[in-house]
Amino acid sequence: MNTLLQTIADGDPLSRPEAEEAMATMMSGSARDEHIAALLMGLRTRGETLDELVGFTKTMREFAVSVETDDPQTIDLCGTGGDGASTFNISTTASFIAAGAGATVAKHGNRSVSSQSGSADVLEALGVQIDLEKEGVEHCLHEAGIAFLFAPFFHPAMRHVMPVRKALGVRTFFNILGPLCNPAGVTRQIVGAFDTSTAQTMVRILAELDADHVITLHADDGLDEVSISASTTLFEYDASDQNPVPRSHEVGPERHDLDRASISTLEGGTAQQNASILRNILSGEDQGPRRDVALLNAAYALHVSDQYADLDACLEAAAESIDSGAALDALNTLASVSKEAKSE
């Protein structure tokens, strides 16, 4: 580790193998806290290179508890958090809509970062058993077509760096890595970022690590979701393209014939309040902006699953998922199956 720290102190980049070595040293518990702090702050000050981030991500994935899925088109919707907007749980709601439309969803998440209610918090309030280990999650994926992968259970090696991260109290490259390290090994993702530059970096990392179809994004109103209150910058990588490279484009709700709405209409609250909002959307009771933003994010998730012809078809499928009751069924089934898995 001393040699790697000297390289950083000299202002030189780590090679990809050196980044892998540094991460393996941290994840195995072999690094001293002061060395971890020096590495994190040295790279934060200088700025990480793509090779460094790819090496870190690759190794963090190797240290995760692996979850098997039968469906190679399994998707995930997650984000870095930290957008400070305190919206309801948009990507979690969209996950159930996507599952109701036929996608297999391995939802990777944690407790709250910047709001009162993270994905784990709202799912717990909805009666989903979140503290499932590998076998329980695999059971949910097989029986319900959707599962929640509670990050602390699947990234146990992170305990070696958590005290330093908490003590530093600033964003580091670990804030970027988490959403890129789904334990189910998904190659199809929607990943929201806390700024546009980070979204662009994340798509390049995923492209280097054999993604099939991914979109990273950041909205002009600050959301790490596809927004209906502002335009959203998307960075898309599709390995099936004739010339597969990350491409960027901007979308507003008008592109999908949806009305713009103030970001205040998307405001959430406590886990219990967000659970009520989510259930009202899935039941079809809420026909307003919250439904629209959930549909939009579900549509882009279905888009990266490549199960529908185009985005318009994805949006129609998302609406049908709610209107047919399939999205609500996906929630109720996960709640039931997750409890079965916990009791086994």
Swiss-Prot record:
Q: Which HAMAP family match?
A: TrpD (MF_00211)
Matching InterPro entries, A to Z? Anthranilate_Pribosyl_Tfrase, Glycosyl_Trfase_fam3, Glycosyl_Trfase_fam3_N_dom, Glycosyl_Trfase_fam3_N_dom_sf, Nuc_phospho_transferase
Q: Which Pfam families match?
A: Glycos_trans_3N (PF02885), Glycos_transf_3 (PF00591)
Quote the protein name from its UniProt record: Anthranilate phosphoribosyltransferase
Which pathway is recorded for this entry? Answer: Amino-acid biosynthesis; L-tryptophan biosynthesis; L-tryptophan from chorismate: step 2/5
Subunit description: Homodimer.
Gene Ontology BP, a term: L-tryptophan biosynthetic process
Cofactor remark: Binds 2 magnesium ions per monomer.
